[in-house]
């Protein structure tokens, strides 16, 4: 009987040792599986962080470029605004000169009709020449006025584009 108990004891202890050994094998496999899953998760998080950093850098670059373009457009708009103001001032000067030349031409025409002497005729011719020169200045003033209006339109279109950005 002792031998039967001994055999049963050996069989049971062999079974228990085999079970423990098998359990440790499975625990090792599960630990390896869990470590691999954790490693994949860490790698995925790292890749996501790198992608997000890339997006942040790209976004910052886009903002910086937009600010730089905005500053350039503002500088151009200020320059064009100054140019337009200068052209307006020039146009006013030419308009005043044109008005004076027109008054002189009207005076010359009035004098021309009333003069009969040679000296007065010469004065009339001079005033007529002055009127012709005034007409030339008037044409120049008209050209510069048109250039100023064109410049103003370009300035306003640039300013509108800036506000749309």
Curated annotation (Swiss-Prot):
Residues 1-22 form the signal peptide. InterPro entries: DUF2514. Keywords: Signal. Pfam families: DUF2514. To phage N15 gp55. A putative lipoprotein (RzoQ, AC C1P601) is entirely encoded within this gene, on the same strand within another reading frame. This is Uncharacterized protein RzpQ. The lineage of its organism: Bacteria, Pseudomonadati, Pseudomonadota, Gammaproteobacteria, Enterobacterales.
């Amino acid at each position: 009987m002792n031998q039967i108990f001994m055999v049963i004891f050996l069989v049971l202890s062999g079974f228990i040792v085999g079970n423990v050994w098998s359990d440790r094998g499975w625990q090792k496999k599960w630990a390896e599986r869990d470590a691999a899953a954790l490693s994949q998760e860490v790698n995925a998080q790292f890749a996501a962080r790198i992608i997000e950093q890339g997006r942040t850098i790209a976004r910052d670059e886009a903002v910086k470029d937009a600010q730089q373009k905005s500053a350039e457009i503002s500088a151009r708009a200020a320059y064009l605004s100054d140019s337009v103001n200068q052209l307006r001032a020039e146009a006013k000067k030419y308009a005043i000169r044109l008005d004076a030349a027109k008054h002189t031409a009207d005076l010359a025409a009035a004098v021309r009709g009333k003069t009969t002497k040679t000296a007065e005729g010469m004065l009339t011719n001079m005033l007529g020449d002055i009127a012709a020169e005034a007409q030339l200045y008037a044409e120049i003033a008209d050209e510069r006025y048109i250039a100023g209006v064109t410049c103003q339109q370009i300035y306003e279109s640039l300013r509108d584009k800036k506000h749309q950005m």
